[in-house]
C-alpha cells in the first residue's frame, strides 16, 4: 500500500448537515449533499471519464460476490477478538418467503442486541431491509445456492455512531478517503479537542486493515475475488471502540453506480477524491 500520502481531516459543522437534511425534507426528497448512491453511468463518466490513463476501467454496477461476508468472516472475527462463530444455511424456500415479507441485519427494528433463539434470528432477518435485500441478491445470483447466516459473538462495543466507511478506488491500491458512517449525527469522538489525533488513529488502523484485506484476497483460491476488487474497488467499514481499537466490521462495493452510500461525501461532487485522483487522503467528520 502507498504510504506516502498526506492526510487531511475535515470537521464539518453538524449544523450544515442538519440544514441539508431539513432542506431536503421541506422539498419531500432525499438530500443530495451527502450519502448519495445509485448514480447513472453518465453522471459519473462526466466527472471520471473511462478509458483514460489514470482510470482505464469502465464504470459498472459493482459485483456483490467479492464483498460477501463469508469470504471475510475469519478476518473480521480476528479483528474483533472472536475465535469462533456459527454459520447455517437458510433453505431457499424459507429465504424466498422471508424476502417476500418485507442486507448483515444491522438496521433491524430490534437494534443492537443479543440473539439467543432461532426466533430472534428470524426476527432479525424479516425486520431488516438490508437482510432482505441480501437474501434477494443471493437468490438472484444463483439458482441453487442457499443463503447463509453467520452468528458472531456479541460485541458490546459495536455501534454505528462509532463506525467509519473507508473508500478504496479501483486500480489505486490505497485508501482515498474515510467518512464517519452514521452521517446524520455528530461523530462520537472521545474529545473534540483531540479530534485530529483520534482521526489519525482511525486512519492508521484502517490502513492496517486494508493491508490485511489485500493479503487475505491474495491467498483466496478464487482469483476472481481479488481481480474484481482491483477492477471495481471496494469500501469497508471499521469500528473505533471506546478503548481505542480499530476493528474490521464489513466490506462493501465501491462506486457511484453502486448502492453503497457515500456518507458525508457525494459520489459525484467528491468523485475526484473518492476515485483516488487527488494526492491527499481526506477524513471527514461532523461535529
Regions found by a protein language model. Name each.
Residues 84, 164, 168, 260-263:
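Generic recognition of cysteine residues
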Residues 109-200, 205-229, 233-248, 253-254:
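Phosphate-binding site of ATP-dependent enzymes
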Residues 1-125:
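Conserved N-proximal alpha/beta basic substrate-recognition cap immediately N-terminal to
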Residues 18, 80, 96, 180, ...:
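Residue-identity detector for glutamine
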Amino acid at each position: 500500500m502507498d504510504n506516502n500520502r498526506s492526510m487531511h481531516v475535515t470537521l464539518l459543522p453538524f449544523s450544515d448537515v442538519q440544514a441539508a437534511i431539513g432542506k431536503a425534507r421541506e422539498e419531500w426528497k432525499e438530500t443530495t449533499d451527502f450519502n448519495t448512491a445509485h448514480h447513472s453511468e453518465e453522471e459519473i463518466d462526466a466527472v471520471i471519464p473511462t478509458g483514460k490513463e489514470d482510470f482505464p476501467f469502465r464504470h459498472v454496477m459493482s459485483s456483490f460476490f467479492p464483498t460477501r461476508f463469508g469470504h471475510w468472516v475469519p478476518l473480521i472475527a480476528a479483528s474483533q477478538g472472536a475465535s469462533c462463530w456459527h454459520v447455517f444455511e437458510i433453505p431457499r424456500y424459507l429465504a424466498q418467503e422471508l424476502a417476500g415479507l418485507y442486507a448483515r441485519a444491522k438496521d433491524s427494528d430490534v437494534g443492537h442486541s443479543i440473539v439467543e433463539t432461532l426466533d430472534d434470528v428470524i426476527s432479525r432477518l424479516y425486520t431488516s431491509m438490508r437482510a432482505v435485500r441480501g437474501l434477494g441478491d443471493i437468490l438472484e445470483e444463483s439458482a441453487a445456492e442457499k443463503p447463509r447466516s453467520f452468528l458472531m459473538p456479541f460485541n458490546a462495543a459495536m455501534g454505528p455512531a462509532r463506525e467509519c466507511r473507508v473508500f478504496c478506488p479501483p486500480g489505486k491500491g490505497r485508501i482515498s478517503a474515510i467518512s464517519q458512517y452514521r452521517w446524520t449525527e455528530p461523530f462520537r469522538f472521545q474529545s473534540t479537542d483531540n479530534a485530529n489525533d483520534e482521526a489519525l488513529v482511525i486512519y492508521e488502523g484502517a490502513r492496517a486493515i486494508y493491508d490485511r484485506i489485500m493479503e487475505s484476497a491474495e491467498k483466496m483460491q478464487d482469483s476472481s475475488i481479488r481481480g474484481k476488487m482491483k477492477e471495481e474497488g471496494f469500501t469497508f467499514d471499521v469500528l473505533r471502540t471506546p478503548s481505542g481499537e480499530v476493528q474490521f466490521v464489513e466490506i462493501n462495493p465501491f462506486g457511484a453506480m453502486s448502492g453503497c452510500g457515500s456518507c458525508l461525501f457525494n459520489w459525484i461532487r467528491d468523485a475526484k477524491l473518492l476515485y483516488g485522483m487527488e494526492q491527499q487522503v481526506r477524513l471527514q467528520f461532523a461535529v
